[in-house]
Amino acid sequence: SMHMGYEPGTYLPEADAILVIDCDVPWIPSLHKLNPDAKVIQLGADPLFENYPVRGFPCDLGIRGSAGSAIPMLEEAMAIRAKSAGARIDARRAKIAGIKGDQAAANQGRIDKIASGTAAMDNAWVAHCLNQVKQDDDVLVSESQLALGNIALREPGSFFGTSPSGGLGWGLGAAHGVKLGQRAKRVFCVVGDGAYMFGNPTPAHFVSAAYDLPVLTVIMNNKMWGSVRKATLGLYPEGAASSSNKAPLTYLDPAPEYHKIVEASDGYGEEVTDPADLPAALERGIKAVDVDERQAVINVHTTYDDAAAKADAVR
């Protein structure tokens, strides 16, 4: 695989060609700098997003068309040129393999620390454990900062995330919509604790029970508005909020026992505070959904310290 992860900033400065596919914000200009000689190709039904009042991304070549139709045509055209560029392609593939190996080693080191108890449970661990129990044709709906680099997504339609326009609380309803449309599929819904509250969990779980839509919801509960903390530290890394022990309008503490809300609608709820307990908890949630045909909520206590928030803010 040539997939390099979900953070483009590391590779943009040395890229000589950038193909943007149906993406209105492919990078953050204030954070990510392009190679000045790079050629930017934008592909999509509206490659320039002409209905946006302001959009300042460069475009050396705009290709208007459906990505599903255009990409196979582009692949066919590139295959002809590849015949004369074998050595360059092999060198590039070897370089990328090395980078991916370094990424995998760093990620595994992080997972090993959590597994050994020398690091606290975070989003990467949740993703790692989910990846151990999910099947390729399961559907994952995420309104969270889930570490997608730890999730193997191999099947089309197996992942749904929030749109660029946002919509706080989207995740719970979207997951039930996916289950309603694909009843034979197992559906995971991963949300932050703030997104869970925005999703109106009481009516969401009522609808799940009333319409027989057993979804397994995983709450990554860091007891805060993580996006607010990240954005604040990104804009004002040395500001008053960064030196505050508990910045206002950020923390959701004391945290409710979210896993008990689902029990009011005859669902299965469980709380996880120890990383070692998460795999078994997920299996119990899957049993509730698959065997008992009940919805389930796993309330996972995670950490998100200021160092992680600052690092995320500049990716």
What do these predicted regions represent?
Residues 8-12, 63-67, 71, 85-92, ...:
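Generic structural signal for well-ordered, non-membrane alpha-helical segments
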Residues 97-184:
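Active-site diphosphate/adenylate-binding microenvironment
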Residues 23, 145, 302:
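Short glycine-/small-residue-rich Rossmann-like dinucleotide-binding loops
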Residues 2-3, 12-15, 55-56, 64, ...:
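Thiamine diphosphate
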Residues 19-20, 42, 142, 189, ...:
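Redox-cofactor binding/interface segments in oxidoreductases and associated redox assembly factors
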Residues 46, 142-148, 221-225:
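Short glycine-enriched loops at secondary-structure junctions
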Residues 1-96, 282-286:
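Glycine-rich, acidic loop regions that bind phosphate or pyrophosphate groups
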Residues 16-22, 48, 71-82, 100, ...:
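Structural signal for hydrophobic packing residues in well-ordered secondary-structure cores
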